[in-house]
């Protein structure tokens, strides 16, 4: 083979799309599509048609640029097999490692609290509205559901992980199917409410504030940051030795881009389908009732007068069941991350990092009691889920997903080539706007 043929062959091999790339594209996509998606239509549709159209424009840039920034941070470490904690420690020392451990824990733990509230409300709504049963005590329901999940986690962790992986695709398929099935019920209410002469840009209900608050729920819903570190390590081990780090970075960016496109297409279609079926007032009611949009849809179809179609009856029951399954799936997935993070913190500060001083069983028990206990307290208190996402969940995710990579790009020599780019300004702005939601909630 001539030198030219060798070069052409090498270039073809480099540019080819591998099966593993498709697997990771779907993996990133599947990680993001969870219970958080069930709240996005409520916040997105709350302000009517114009804000959700602006969110549609912002959705892909937020998903792609923010996750690409985190991937670049993970790629910047000298060890191809090093995870994000090792990379941050390499750039900023042991203190950086402690900070990232705290960030990971506090980025995931509030999500468990959110899911604890959600699963309690969804179950009680299904019990009272679809099954027509008498109301139950909230504290007892929350305790029962959490003990049930704790039992499954304690005695069947491996089975739980396997079942979770099987649930991802049926859930995504059900979202697409519901979105399509709602089309016959679309109406023009959301379009009829658009009055260009009375549109307010500022103020409590203005378009800018609505979109600003919507950015938080987008950061929360379009989030696959927990898996980015593992994804980058896998791609570095696959590509870096043969093709170099620059090629690996381009390949990671390409995969993140395709995953973001899939994610935005599915979630935004679902949001628009819900909005055209319901109305901004319905979305406000769903927020006030503190339930996911599928539960509200179930109640909406249950309240239809006259003879209901078979689909309406199926959706009335199916939507709540799908919501429950989605929340269980998301709770289990985030529990594993929370447990790992809390175990690390307890080990680091309680036992000075000495694994010989405590058994893994005892460590898991201590962490489980704290996690389930705190989740039960929050579930019983029943704070508004969207407010909790905007004030706690999304800002912590944004600090990890947006601001940490931007700080690293400014400080770490290995990331110097990414300085001075316009997309850095965009990612920083998204991170700051999301965190500033905390200030907005205070006033």
From Swiss-Prot:
Q: Which reaction does it catalyse?
A: L-threonine(in) + H(+)(in) = L-threonine(out) + H(+)(out); L-serine(in) + H(+)(in) = L-serine(out) + H(+)(out)
Compartments, record wording:
Cell inner membrane
Q: Which InterPro entries match?
A: Amino_acid_transport_2 (IPR018227), Hydroxy_aa_transpt (IPR004694), Thr/Ser_transpt_TdcC (IPR023726)
What Pfam families has UniProt attached to this entry?
A: Trp_Tyr_perm (PF03222)
| Highest taxon of the lineage | Bacteria
User: What UniProt keywords are attached to this protein's entry?
Assistant: Amino-acid transport, Cell inner membrane, Cell membrane, Membrane, Symport, Transmembrane, Transmembrane helix, Transport
TM helices/strands, residue ranges: 22-42, 44-64, 97-117, 140-160, 163-183, 207-227, 259-279, 319-339, 366-386, 389-409, 423-443
Main localization (coarse): membrane
Q: What does this protein do?
A: Involved in the import of threonine and serine into the cell, with the concomitant import of a proton (symport system).
Its protein name is Threonine/serine transporter TdcC
Q: Write down the species.
A: Salmonella arizonae (strain ATCC BAA-731 / CDC346-86 / RSK2980)
